[in-house]
Amino acid sequence: MLEQINSPYDLKKLDIKDLPRLSEEIRQFIVEKVSKTGGHLASNLGIVELTLALHYVFNSPVDKIIWDVGHQCYVHKMITGRRDKFDTLRQFNGLSGYTKRTESIHDIFGAGHSSTSLSAALGIATARDLKGEKYHVIAVIGDGALTGGMALEALNNIGRSRKDVIVILNHNEMSISENVGSLSLYLSKLRTDPTYNKVKQEIDNLLNIIPPIGKSLHKYIEKIKDSIKQLVVPGMFFEELGFTYLGPIDGHNVEELIEVLERSKKMKGPLLIHVVTKKGKGYMFAEKRPDKFHSAAPFDIETGKFVGEGKDSYSDVFGKTLAEMALKDEKIVAITAAMPEGTGLIHFAKLIPDRFFDVGIAEQHATTFAAGLAVEGYKPYFAVYSTFLQRAYDQVIHDVCIQKLPVVFAVDRAGIVGEDGETHQGVFDISFLRAIPNIAIMSPKDANELVEMVKLSRNLDFPVAIRYPRGKAGEYDISRKPSFPLGKGEVLLEGEKIAVFALGRMVSKSIDAAEILKGHGINPFVVNLRFVKPLDEELILEISNKVDLVVTVEDNVIAGGVGSAILELLNDKKVYRPVLRLGFPDKFIEHGDVESLFKKYGLDSQSIADTILQRYKEMRGS
């Protein structure tokens, strides 16, 4: 049946009775494809019926369906003509794992970060009304994303606007008992009936025109009605914001979903439809551990085991090191914004739960929460992906750095992350953090250096950012102690004529590039910078004065990066040397495997060597 579906129009040809069977085919397809490519499995398995119902009832792309975060869009992509591209999901030059406006007219709004859909939906609905057009605007948002402050701001604004916006709350974490669910479903059916709403309004009008008893009676009835609703309707919060609340609805009963969505099309004003789904539905391992299969690496379908499972990542190295430190130091606390597994803080959470804080999708709050802890003498470590730290930039400046509070930002997924693409590449953090006074920025060349930097940060009494990449870490010794002070780099290879200053994971690539250059008779210095701020100015100036060409290599955009910092230093100190800065260009970096992206942008070892060799030859006129 799935083979027949290449557009929403094809889906609408099916009988409703056929949709449950189609749902199962889709789940099998998703498990098979994601097991090979990796991707967001659990959330997509949980939203199959809801996606089918949305495309069955509404007319995309005339009606605008907006997916919050975008990672649960696989079924949407299949229905809208991209099923044949799923072998390339998240691969270099392949299908994006998120909604992307350049990929399809059905992807109304691009996403990757959470809590943005409601604001976008209100903007689109407002534009619709200003232009005098007629179509439906639907935003699909999960209960996790609803914890984001931006989503709550938008809910407040939508309710106040009274505009026709349909919000689908995909509630996939809590089961709702059957009696409450049945009662709520009954109330939803009643309240979605246009006849009921018309009668309700007529009764309200009638009560209001009987003075003075009418008004007081109306008030009394409203009090009774509100009291009853508080007892039996879980959506009172949304009602108070100005929404008509419908639900909860069984998110895996496609016929009920279609019925409610059809009724909702006829209603006016802001609507919130509460849909209950199960993450990972249909695949046993994902149902048991939806957190593990949220963003999954390739895996074995039969066993549920991931390819390469068992090796520690940089996140694990950080998490285990911090947990070991905290066992001996009661002032250390750990904070995550809904990413305990991804950031490696799960190790800390298990050992020291009373000093572990998961604040939900709330990076702004997490940062200022950390600042408050620091004011009272604690040492907070906020582990956050580089791309999500962007969301707390004002708090980093205003609440942490201006007050010079000793908060440590463990900046995970720094640099290129690969398959998640433009919205997740961590290639801006050096640039946006380097401009802020009072903060130290460091980046380890390997896992052992990460252990040392985490321990070094403990006794620094000002803000610190430690940036490290996604990926496996290699061997490391968690008992290591810091072997270098703040702001001190190291010379890894002595050389002549050319100096290569590298940061973080680009150090190993620079060493490999130096070996290639030796084959051309060139022996460059290779320096592990370790620190972006403060720079090891003494070492940089000493080496730069010995060479004809200075090269910087970083896993960050060139604009404002560590190469810019070194160029500024040399200029200020009147050391006039040509500086070749290698990093990412002034563009958003697409999705693909990390090594393919490094090669495309000239940051693999061979490309680094080739670029240096070419520039050196140009300088010599040969």
From Swiss-Prot:
Q: Which GO terms describe its cellular component?
A: cytosol
So where does Mg(2+) get bound? D143, N172
Q: Which GO terms describe its molecular function?
A: 1-deoxy-D-xylulose-5-phosphate synthase activity; magnesium ion binding; thiamine pyrophosphate binding
Quote the cofactor binding remark. Answer: Binds 1 Mg(2+) ion per subunit. Binds 1 thiamine pyrophosphate per subunit.
Coiled-coil positions: none
Q: How does it assemble?
A: Homodimer.
For this protein, the record's HAMAP family field holds:
DXP_synth
Please identify the protein, giving its name as recorded.
1-deoxy-D-xylulose-5-phosphate synthase
Q: Which organism is it from?
A: Caldanaerobacter subterraneus subsp. tengcongensis (strain DSM 15242 / JCM 11007 / NBRC 100824 / MB4)
